[in-house]
Amino acid sequence: MAGHGAGGRRASTSRAAARRVEAETNENDDLAAAAARDLAAAEVPAEVPHFELDEDPAFWKDRNVQVLIRIRPINAAESTANGQRRCLVQDSSKTLSWTGHPDTMFTFDHVACETISQEKLFGVVGLPMVENCMSGYNGCLFAYGQTGSGKTYTMMGELSKLDNELSKDSGLTPRIFEYLFARIKEEEERRREDKLKYICKCSFLEIYNEQITDLLEPSSTNLQIREDIKKGVYVENLMECYVSSVKDVMMLLLQGVANRKMAATNMNSESSRSHSVFTCVIESRWERDSMTHLRFGRLNLVDLAGSERQKSSGAEGERLKEAANINRSLSTLGLVIMTLVDVANGKNRHVPYRDSRLTFLLQDSLGGNSKTTIVANVSPSICSSSETLSTLKFAQRAKLIQNNAKVNEDASGDVMSLQRQIEDLKDQLTCLKKQQNMPGSPSFKLLKSGYGNEFNSLHGVDDQSACDLELLKQKVIHLEDVLVGSLRREKSAETEIRKLECEIKSLNRLVNLMESDTRHLRTTVKLRDEKIRRLELLADNQISSDGYLMDENAAMFQEIQLLQEQINDNSQLTQFALENKRLIEQVRMLEKFSKQGEREMLLTEISLLRNHFLHILEQKYARPPKNMEAQGDVTIKELETCRKELDACLENNVLLAREVNKLRCELKQYQKCGTGQVAPEVVESSVIPGINQKQHDQAGWCGSYLASIDVERQFVDVGITTDITESLELTPPSEIYSENQDSPSRLHFSDPEICDLKNSTKVLEYNSSRNLLDKGIILSGQLENECGLNSVQNDEISLVKENAEKMYGHDEISVYRQNEILHSSEQLLQDELTHIKSLNEGLKEKLIIMAEESTKLSEIIVAKDVEIATLSEEWESAIVDLTSFLTDGCSSLDDAYQNIDNMISSFPYNNHSVSEHVEKAMKVSIEKEKIISRLQIELQAAQRMGREVKEKLHILRGATLAITEAQLLDNDESQEALKLLDLMRQKDCTVQELNDNVKQKSCLFAEATEGYSRHECHLPDNVGTVAEISHNRDGSEVNQANTHYQAKLEDVLHLVEDKSNKVLALFSNFEEAQETMEEAETMLSSLLKANEELKLEKDSCRQAVELLFAERTSLINDLQELEASNSFTAQRYDKLHEQVNGCVAEMTNLATIIKESFHQVQRVTTVELFAFCSEVISFGQDLRKWIYESRSYLVNMGALLEEQGNSYAEQNRRTNSSTYAGVSQQVESCSRQLGGMNGDIFPGTYMVVDGKEKASVHVVPFGSNAELEDTNVERTFDMDYASLRREFDRKSDVAEGLSFDLKLLQESTSQAKDMKDKADEISDALVSVQRELEKKTSAMESILKQQKVLEEELAENGAALLILRSELEHSESLSSELFKENNNLKVMLEEEAMMISETKAMLEDKSKVIEGLEHEILLLNSSEEGRLMSQIKELNDNLKIISIDKGNLEEEILKLTDKLEMAVALAEENEAASIEARQAAEISKVYAEEKEEEVRILERSVEELESTITVLEEEVCNLKEEVRSYQIYKKSEAEQAQEMFIVDSTSKCDATEQLCPGRCQLEKRLKAEIIAHQDARRKIECLTMEASCKDEEVRQYKEHIAELVLHSEAQSLLFQEKYQEMEHMISKQKFGLHESNSDTGHTKFEKPSGRTRGSGSPFRCISSIVQQMNSEKDQEISVARQRIEELEGLVCNKQKEICMLTSRLAAVDSMTHDIIRELLGVKLDMTNYANMLDQEELQKLLMASQQQIEQSKAKDVELDMLKEQFDHLIQERDSLFDDMDQRKADLLESQLLIEQLEQREQMLEAQNGILQMEKDNLQQRIMEMDEEIQLLVGSNQAIAETTFQMGSNHRSANSEFSRRLAQSDMLLSHARHEHSRLQAAKSSRTRRGSHQ
C-alpha cells in the first residue's frame, strides 16, 4: 500500500509539474481557450447498463423476507459537484459491487437499476404482497435509505390521476390499492356462490420526534401504543376509515401526505421529517357448508425518514432535533435487525422492540407473523458513498431475518346461530308441508289446474314429430338418473354415518373401560396409601400391633356397613330389571305383529301402484301425441318443481342428518357421565309405549293402510328402545348395528316410494287414474300429517328423556359408585401383590422387547442407510445422466431447428411436402420439449420425495439414537468394561506393531551388514588374483605375453582403483557406523545417567506420593473432624438461633403487651382524670357562683327586711297619729252604711278568710277598725317572714347539698391522687420492664455478635476447608502427574534397555566386521602394493580428524542446545515483548487516529483557505467584468469621437455652431469616466486591503503549521524513545510480570480515549492540540511513574507469594509423607493388579509421550505464529512510520504550495500596483485630453490629430491591459488546478488511511 501511495504521489507531482510548464508556455492564450480546456477536462457521463428484474412466482412459498435494492440516478447537484463518478457498479439483476476500498460484492433478492420503471417495480414487489394479504398473510413493505435517496418516490410517487388512470410516476402504494380492488372485484364475482365479501379498513399515522400522530385526524397527537393478546400491537384511538375503491384510498393518501411533516434541507428540497405508516386491514368473509369463514390480512406500507448527517444536510435548530430522533429510531431498527439475525443463528438474545416507537409498532413485521419486503434506496454518487455502504450492510443483515408467517383464518361458525337456523328451517318445513297438504292451498290448486290442463291437452293434441317425445323421454331418464344418484348418495352417507356411529360407540366403550380402570386404580391406590401409612406408623412404633389390628378391623367394619347400606338403598335395581323384561316382551310382540303380514301388504300395494304407473306411461307414449308443445312446457315446469323439491328434500336430509349427529353427540356426552344408565332408559322404555299407543289411537281413523304405517313407525321407535335395553344388557356390537340398520332402512325404503307416488300423481292425468291420483294425494297428506305428529311425539319423547335423565342421574351415579366400592373392596387384598408382580414382569418383558426391537431397528436403519446411500448415488447418477441427456437433446433440438431453418431458406421454391415434413418435425420437437419439461418436473418431484425420505430417515435415526441412548444408559457398566477390553487390545496391538517395526528395522540392518560383508569378501579375491599374476610373471611365458600382461595389468589397475574407491566408500560407511556407535554410546551414557536420575526422582516421587497420601488421610480426617465440628456447631447454632428467636419473640410479645396495657391505662386514667377534673372544676365554679349569689341575696334580703321594718314602724306611727281620724270617720260611715247588712258581711268575710286564717277572720267582726288594721299589718309581716323562712330553709338545704358535694369532690380528688400514685407505680414498673428489655436486648446483641463470630468462624472454617480441598486436589493432581511421569520413565527405561540391547548386537556385528577388516588389512600389508597401505593410513588419519571434528561438533551441538534453550527463553520474553508491542501498536494506532483528526482539522483550515481563495477569485472575476465593461465603454467613446471628427471634416462651415454642444457632451463623458475611475480605484484599494489581510492569515497559518510540524516531530521522537524504553524494560523484565504489563498496556490503551476533539475553527483546534500534546506528555510521565510504582508493588507481591508458596510446599511435603505411609499399606492389596497396571502404564506413557510431542509441536507452531505476528507488527510499525514520513512530506508539499500561492499573490499585488499606475497615467492622459479639447476650439485639424493620437494611445493601453489581465487569468487558473490536485491527493490519502 505504501509503495502504491508513493507511486501515486510521484505521478501526481510529475503531472503537476507538466501542467505548470504548460501553463507557463500558454500564458498568452485568451480566455476562450481556457474555458474550452475546462470543459474538456470535465468527465463524460458513462452509459448505465440496464438489467431487467426477474419475477419469481414461487419465491413466497418457502420464504418470508425479501430484500430489494433500488439505485436512483445521479441528480444535477451531484453531477456538478463530483461529475459522474460512482461508488456502485451493478453486475447483474441480483448483485452489485461497491467500488471503494476494499472492493466488496453484495447479493440480494433483486437489484433495481436506475432505468427500472415504477410499474415494473410494482410487478416484482407490490403484486405478490397483495396476493399474500388476500390469502390471509400479514404483509409489510418499507423503504429504507438516506435522505434524498428516493424512498417517498418509491412508496408514494405522484398521487394525481389522469383520466382515471395512474401516471407512470405513481408509487407502490397507489398501484397496490388499484390492483387490490381489482382483485377484490374479481374474487367476489368468481365466488358469488360462497357469498364472499371483502372489507378494507385503512389508517395513516406518522412518528414525528418519537410521538405518534394520526394523519387523518391531526388534532389527535401523542397517541399511545398498546398490546393485546387478540389484537397484537395496535395504536390506541387511531382513526380507521372503511374504503371500497381506489378513489377513497387516494383521498386518504392525499389528506395524510398534506398533514405530514416535510421540510427542505441541503440534500433534498422536500425531505420527509417523520416515519409514515399506512395500514390496510383486508377482511374476507364467506360461507361454506353452513360454516362462516373469516380471513384477514394486515398490510403495512412504511415510508421511513432518511438517515442524514448534520454536515451534509445543514440541519439546525428544529431540523437538527428531527434528524437526531430519526437517526435514533433508525439505529434502534438496525439493532433490532442485528439481534434478530443472532436469534436466527441460534443465540439467545433479547430483541429491544420497545426501545423505539417504530420497532414496537413493526414488531410482527420484524421477526414475527408477516411476509416482509425491504426496499433499500441508495445513491450511486461518490459523494454519498459512506451512506450507501451503510445502507447495503443494513440490507444484507436484514436478509438474514427469519419470520414465521401464518394464515389468519377463523373457520369456526356460530353454533348458536346454526342451531337457530336449523329450528327456523324445521318450522318452515312443517308449515310448507301443511300448506301443500291442505285442499285450499295454492300448491294444491296449482296441482289441480295442472292436471286439468294436461287432461285437456291430452284430449286435444295434434300430430307432431317423434323427436319431441324422445327429448321428453331423455329428460325423464335424466331426472330418474338424478333421483337414483341422490338416493345412492344418501345411502352411502347413511352407511358412513352408521359406521362412524359404531366406531364412536366402540370408542365410548373403550373410554368407559379406561375410566373404570382408572377409578379402580385410584381406589386401590388410596387403600394402599392408607395401609402403608398404618404400616409405617406400626413400623415406627407409634401404634401398637393390637391397636393397629383394632383400627383395621374397625375400618373394615365401617366399609362393610357402608357397602350394606348402599346395597339396601339400591332396591330399585330389581324393579328396573322387571321393567326391562316387560319392555322386551312388548318389543317382541310388536315384532311379531309387524311380521304377520302388514309389511307384505304394504309392499304388494306399492308394487301394484308401480305396475299401474308403468301401464299408464306405456299407454301415454303409445298413443299419438297432440299439442306436444304445451305439454312439453307443462312437463318442464313440473320437472323444475320436482327438481326444486328434490333439492329442498336433500337439504332437509342434510340438516336432519346434522341434527341426528348432534343428538347422538349429546347422547354420547350423557352416556359418558355414567356407564350404568339403567334407570333413565327404563323410564324411557316405559314412557315410549304409552306415547306410541296414543299415536296409534290418534291415527285410527286413517284406515288399515295408515295403521300399518303407524305400526311400522311404532316399531321403529320401539327399535330404539330395544337398542338401548340391549346395550344395557351388553349385547354384541353386531346386533346393535343390525338393529340400527333396520329402522333407517325402512324409512328410506318408504321415502322413495312416496316420491314415486308423488311423481306418478304429477304425471298421470288420465280419467282412468283419477281415483288412484286422489287416493295417492290423500295418502301423501296423511303421511305428512303423521310425520308432523311423529315430530311432535319425538319432541315430547326427548323432553321425557331429559327429565328422566335429570331425575335418575344421581341414583345412577350412586349405584355406580357403590358397585365400584364393592368391587374394589372385594378384589383389593387378593389382586394387590399379583398386580404389582405382573406389572413388574410386564415392564421387564417390555424392556427386553424394546431392546430387541431397538437393535433390530438399528440394524434395519443401517441397512436402509446403506440402501439409501446406494440409491441416492444411483439416483444422482441417473439425474446426471438425465440432465446430460436432456441438455444433449435440447442442443440437438436447437441444431435441428437451425438445420430446418437453413433447409427452408435454401429451398428456392416452396414445396408443400417439405413444409409438411418440417411441421411434423416441429411438432415432434415440441412434443419432445414437453416430455423433457415433464421429465424435469418429475425429476424435481422425485428429488423432493428423496428429501422427504431423507428427512423421515433422519427422524427415524433420531428415534433409534434416542432408543439406543436409553439402552446405553442401562448398559453403561458393560460398555465401560468392553471399552477397557478394547483399549487393552489396542494397546496390545500397538505393542505388537512396535515389535514388528523393531524386527523389520533389525532385518534391514542385517541385510545392510550382509551386503557390506559381501563387498569385503570380494576384496581378498581380487588381491589373490593380483598375487597370482605377479607370481606367474617370473615364468617363461612372461616374455611371450608381455604386451598382453601389460594390458591386463592396466585392466587390473583400473579394477584396483575401482575397488579402492569401493573400499573408500566402505571406509566412509565404516566411519559413519563408528559415528553412529559413538553417538549410541553417548546416548547410552546419557540415557543411563537419565535412568539413574529418573530412579532417584522415582524414589523421591514415591516418597512424595507416600507423603501426599499421608497428608491426604490427615486432611480427610481433619475434614471429617471439621465437618463433624461444623455440623455440631451448626446444630448448636440452630438451637441457639431457635432459642434466641423464641426469646426475642417472647420479649417482643411482652413488650408489646406491656406497652399496650400501659398505653391503655394511661389513656383511661388521663381521660377519666381530665373528665373528673373538668367536672370538679365546673362544679366548684358553680358552687362559688351560687354561694356568692346566695350571700348577696341574703345581704339584700336582710337589707330589705330592715328597710321594711323601718317602713312598717313609720307607717304605724303615721297611721296612729295622722290618719287615725280619717280612718275612724270612714269606719263609722261604713258601719252606718253597713248597719243593715251585718248578716251579709260576716258570712262574706268568713268565706273570704276561711281559706287562710280562721282566727283572724273570726276576730274581725268583734274588734274595732284599728285592731283590724294592726292585724292586717301583722298578717303581712307574718306572711313575709314565713316566705323568708322558707327561702332560708331552702338555702340551708342547698348549702348542705353543696357541702355534701364538696365532700364528694374531696373524695374524688383523693381517688385521683390514688390513681396518679398507681399510674406512677405502673410507669416505674414500665421503666423497670424497659430496663429489663434493654438488658435482654443487649444480651441478644451479644448473642447475635457471638452468632456472627460463629458464622465468621464457620466461614473461615469453610474457606480453610476449601483451601484444604484445593490443596488436596492439587496434591492429588501432583501425585497423578508424578505417577504418570513414573510410568513414562518406566517406559523410557524399557525402551532404552531395548535400544541398549540392539546397540550391543550392532556393536558385536560391527566388531566382527572390524576384525574381518583388520584381517584384510594385514593381508593387504603383506602384499606388495604399499600405496594401499599409505592410503589406508591416510584414511585412518582422516578418520581421526573426523572423530576430532565430531567431538567438536558434539560440543557445538551442546552449545547449540544451550543456545536453543536460551532462544526458547528469549522467545518467551519475546512473547511478552510482542504483547507489549501489540499494545504499543494499538497505542500508536490511536495516536495515528488522533493525528488523522489533526490532519482533518488542518484540512478544514485548508478548506477555509480555499473558500477565501474562491472569494478572491470571484472578486477578480468581478474586476475582469468591470475592466471589460470599461473597455467596451472606451471603445464606444472612441467610435463616437471618430464620428465627431467625420462630422467636423464634412461640415466645416457649421463647426462653430456644433462646437458648443459637442464640448458639453465630452465634458459629461469625461466626468463619468472620472467617477468610474474613482470607483475602480476604491475597489482596488479594498482588494489590496483584503489581500494584505489574507497575507497575514496565510502567515499565521504558516506559523501554526510550522508549530504543528515541530510538535509532531517532537511527539514522534518521544514515541520512539518510549518504544525503545519499553523494549529495554521488556528485555529486563521477568516472566512473572506479564500480567502487570498487560494491565498497564490496557491503561495505556485507555489513556488516549479521553482526548477531546477540537473546536470548529482551525486556530482554536491548533491551540487545543498544543495543549493536548503538553497534557499528554504530563499524563505519560505520570503513567510511567505509576507503572514503576506498580511494578515495584508487583515485585513485593510476587516475593510474598513466593514465601506463601514455600510455606505451602512445606505443608504439602508433610502431607505427602503421610500419604506415602498410607500408600505403603495400600500396596499390599495392589499386587494382583500389577500386570494390568504395567500394561496400562505402558500405554499411558506412550500416550503421554505422544501428547508431549504434539504439545511441543503445537508450541513450536505457536512460536512461529507469534514470530509472524511480531514481524507483522514490526511491518505495521514501519508502515506507520512510513505514513508519518509521507504525511510530513505532504505537509512540506503543502507548505511549498502555500509559499507558491503567496508568491503568486505577491505577483498579483504587483500587477495590481502596475494597474494602479496605469490608471493614474490614464487619468493624466484624460487631463491632457481635456486640455487638448480646449485647444480643439481653435482649429479643427489639431482636434483631428489629437483625437487620432488619443485613439491610438487608448488602443495601445487597452491592449496592454487586456494582455495583463489574460496573464492574471492564466495564473489564477493555474492556481485553481494546483488546488484541485492538492485536494485529490488529500482525499486519496484519507481513503488510504481509513482503509489501512
Swiss-Prot record:
Residues 406-438, 486-526, 1066-1139, 1303-1357, 1396-1528, 1780-1841 form a coiled coil. Residues 1633-1649 have a biased composition (Basic and acidic residues). SMART domains: KISc. InterPro entries: KIF15/KIN-12, Kinesin_motor_CS, Kinesin_motor_dom, Kinesin_motor_dom_sf, P-loop_NTPase. One of its GO terms (molecular function) is microtubule motor activity. It holds the Pfam family Kinesin. One of its GO terms (cellular component) is microtubule. ATP binds at G145, Q146, T147, G148, S149, G150, K151, T152. Residues 64-401 form the Kinesin motor domain. Keywords: ATP-binding, Coiled coil, Microtubule, Motor protein, Nucleotide-binding. Residues 1-28, 1633-1656, 1870-1892 are annotated as: Disordered. GO terms for biological process: microtubule-based movement; mitotic cytokinesis. Belongs to the TRAFAC class myosin-kinesin ATPase superfamily. Kinesin family. KIN-12 subfamily. This is Kinesin-like protein KIN-12E. It comes from Oryza sativa subsp. japonica. The gene is KIN12E.
